[in-house]
Amino acid sequence: MLLVYDGPALENHKIPVKVLAQSLTALNRIADVANETIFADKSRVSLSVTTFKKGSFGVELVLDSSIFEAVTDILSGKPASAVANGIAIVSCLLEIFALKKWLKGRAITKIDTIPDREQKTIYVGKDSIVVNNTAFVVFQNSSVKRDCAEFVSPLNIEGISSLQLSDTKKVFEQTAVRRKSLQC
């Protein structure tokens, strides 16, 4: 997972530790809630910073599964399980941020479950978006809503104009101009 902050304030590739820590801690808390919702007590995850990217200010993040789980999976012949768990959590995170951004603080007016699929259609008036059931359950957690706002808090700093969180398939991008859509 790659997290990139951009803007004129980052031309020297530096960001205040307090700002970065607050944002990453909020992201880690959301990952914890997603993990607990998806896997209950079967695994534990945490974010780790692996590399810093040149250019704007980028951080490569890895969701680390618990060692116990990894050893159990290897011994039981399921070495790809930890990777699949991480992918499920990252996908859930990206859907949560996309839903929060789409809502723009508007109240949900209707929710339809899509038969034979693990998805819901969320309505605000006539507008709609389809999200994964798990992402919607995690999104409803009040702490996740607060953490979404904290995650985008670097956009409150003058000169930081955007942040982007992505995996190999999906990208979530938020600009400073539109940051209020992720506020509580």
Where is each model-derived feature located?
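Charged, alpha-helical interface segments at or near domain boundaries
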Residues: 1-184
